[in-house]
Curated annotation (Swiss-Prot):
Specifically methylates guanosine-37 in various tRNAs. Its main location: cytoplasm. It catalyses: guanosine(37) in tRNA + S-adenosyl-L-methionine = N(1)-methylguanosine(37) in tRNA + S-adenosyl-L-homocysteine + H(+). Belongs to the RNA methyltransferase TrmD family. GO terms for molecular function: tRNA (guanine(37)-N1)-methyltransferase activity. This is tRNA (guanine-N(1)-)-methyltransferase. The lineage of its organism: Bacteria, Bacillati, Actinomycetota, Actinomycetes, Propionibacteriales. GO terms for biological process: tRNA N1-guanine methylation. It is an enzyme of class 2 (transferase).
Length: 239
């Protein structure tokens, strides 16, 4: 999988060299390239923004640098196997199922906007050439798309076969198929007693059936309490 990042702050992505993502790059599972959008400007000030058409506050990222960057990084031929992601608060919510879908992609290009956003013709052009995703991490606004791109990267790449040392650990995470889309149950480790708080007795019983039932019940309880939108009538709570 090749990952490209277009940003006016490419140093944001230096963190991809560390931890498991860095190991994945060393092992050849992923190939990471961060690009400075200003490299495709032609004026002394390396300008990437201009005032919005129709008036209004703030600045909008100009289409020209994006177009030239696309031509050089992706090419000028349509290719639906290339996934281009525009992080945006007006995008569709990013979910675990979206991460799973993207984990089989061969090429992902992240377009990280700043200021008030990117000229929409850039998105329209990209959609005419490649597979475009406008995605949001949640109902809040960030200063730019870099943080969102990093979060999406981690959610996607950890699902690539060979990335996780123990792939079974993916099956019991929140939102996973192994959890039926529920939130993960609470986790505990040793010592059994810590500052007056004990590990639930059932987890130390060695009784696998009781442990499985406790974990399932806790997953349902937490999901109903914190994310009722994820539940359905099977758990006694309307969707």
């Amino acid at each position: 999988m090749r990952l490209d990042y277009l940003s006016i702050f490419p140093a944001y992505f230096d963190v991809l060299d560390i931890s498991l993502l860095g190991k994945a790059a060393v092992n050849g599972l992923v190939e990471v390239h961060a690009h400075d959008l200003r490299d495709w400007t032609h004026d002394r000030h390396r300008t990437v923004d201009d005032t919005p058409c129709g008036g209004g506050a703030g600045m909008v990222m100009k289409p020209d640098p994006w177009g030239e960057a696309f031509d050089e990084i992706i090419g000028t031929e349509p290719d639906s196997s290339v996934h281009v992601i525009f992080p945006s608060p007006s995008g569709a919510p990013f979910t675990q199922s979206a991460a799973q879908e993207l984990s089989s992609a061969v090429r992902i290009v992240f377009c990280c906007g700043r200021y008030e956003g990117i000229d929409h013709r850039v998105i329209d052009y990209a959609r005419s050439m490649w597979t475009v995703h406008e995605v949001s991490l949640g109902d809040y606004v960030l200063n730019g798309g870099e943080v969102a791109a990093l979060a999406i990267t981690e959610a996607v790449v950890r699902l690539v076969p060979g990335f996780m040392g123990n792939p079974e650990s993916l099956a019991e995470e929140s939102f996973s198929a192994g959890q039926d889309g529920l939130l993960e149950y609470p986790l505990f480790t040793r010592p059994v007693s810590w500052r007056g708080l004990d590990v639930p007795e059932v987890l130390m019983s060695g009784h696998h059936g009781r442990i499985a039932k406790w974990r399932r019940d806790e997953s349902v309880r937490l999901t109903c309490e914190r994310r009722p939108d994820l539940t359905d009538s099977d758990f006694g709570v309307p969707h």
